[in-house]
Amino acid sequence: MRLTKEQKVTSNQLESDRERYSAYLRSLPFTINLGSHLVVHAGVRPGVPLRRQMVTDLTEIRTMGANPSSRRGLPWYKVYRGRRIVVFGHWPSKAPRLAPRAIGLDTGCVYGGRLTGYIIESNQFVSVPARRAYAAPKR
C-alpha cells in the first residue's frame, strides 16, 4: 500500500504510540445504535439486516452496484428505507446530504471544508470551518 504525503506525516507522528492507537481503534464498534438513529462511517446496504452487513459496507459504501465505493451510481441512502435514520460520513459535499432515512455529515473538513455535527434532539446541524486543508481532494 502506498501512503500519500499527508498519510506519511500522520504515520510518522503516530509511530511512537502506534500500538496503543491501533488497539484502541480495533476496540471500537462499526456502528453506534442510538435507538432512532444508527451512526456508521460510510453507510449500510439497503435491505440487508444490520447483523449481516459486511464491514466494507459500513466503512466504504457509497452507491449501489458492482463497485459500492464508487461515487458514480445510485447513492445507497436514496434507496434505504430502514427503521433507523442512518447518520453517515465518508462522502464529502458542501452541505449535509439529506434523505428521508439518512443524514450525511461529511462536509469536507479534511479538504479544508467544514466540520459538521448533528443534534438529534433538536434536528439541527452545527458546523465550523476547518482550520486548514489536511489533504488534497480526491478526483
Question: What do these predicted ranges mean?
Answer:
Residues M1-L38, P46, R52-R72:
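Active-site neighborhood of divalent metal-dependent phosphoester bond hydrolases
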Residues H37-G43, G104-L105:
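Active-site-proximal beta-strand elements of phosphoester/diester hydrolases
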Residues V48, V55-R139:
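Acidic, His/Gly-rich catalytic cores of divalent-metal-dependent hydrolytic chemistry
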Residues N33, H41, G117-I119:
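Short, well-ordered beta-strand micro-motif
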